[in-house]
Amino acid sequence: MSITAEEKTRLMKEFATKEGDTGSPEVQVAILTSRINTLTEHFKTHKKDNHGRRGLLKMVAQRRKLLDYLKGKEEARYQDLIKKLGIRR
C-alpha cells in the first residue's frame, strides 16, 4: 500500500529545489500525491476499509495545507507543481 524507497528517492530527485532537498513543500506534496494515488486504487477494491480511508483523508488534508502554504508564499512554484503533478483540472 505504501510507496517503495526507490519511488520516494525518484520523487525527491525530480521535485527537489536544490541538491539534497528532501523537505521542501514540492517534495512533500509529490510524495503525498503518490501515496494518495496508491490508496485510491486500494479503495477501489476494498470499499469497506474505513480505517485506511481515515488515513487517506489525513493525507489529503496535509497536502492541501502544504499547497495553501506554497500558494501564499510563491504562486509561480505552486502553479508549476500542480501542473507537473496534474492534481488540478
From Swiss-Prot:
Q: Which GO terms describe its biological process?
A: translation
Record-annotated membrane-spanning stretches: none
Could you tell me which PROSITE patterns the record lists for this protein? Answer: RIBOSOMAL_S15 (PS00362)
Keyword Repeat among UniProt keywords: no
* Entry keyword set: Ribonucleoprotein, Ribosomal protein, RNA-binding, rRNA-binding
The highest taxon in the source lineage is: Bacteria
Q: Name one GO molecular function term.
A: rRNA binding
Q: List the disulfide bonds.
A: none
Q: Which GO terms describe its cellular component?
A: cytosolic small ribosomal subunit
Q: How does it assemble?
A: Part of the 30S ribosomal subunit. Forms a bridge to the 50S subunit in the 70S ribosome, contacting the 23S rRNA.
Q: What does this protein do, in the record's words?
A: One of the primary rRNA binding proteins, it binds directly to 16S rRNA where it helps nucleate assembly of the platform of the 30S subunit by binding and bridging several RNA helices of the 16S rRNA.
Q: Which PANTHER family does the entry link to? A: RIBOSOMAL PROTEIN S15, BACTERIAL AND ORGANELLAR, SMALL RIBOSOMAL SUBUNIT PROTEIN US15M
**What family does this belong to?**
Belongs to the universal ribosomal protein uS15 family.
The identity of this protein, by name, is Small ribosomal subunit protein uS15
Q: Per the UniProt entry, what species is this protein from, by scientific name?
A: Ruegeria sp. (strain TM1040) (Silicibacter sp.)
**What gene is it encoded by?**
rpsO
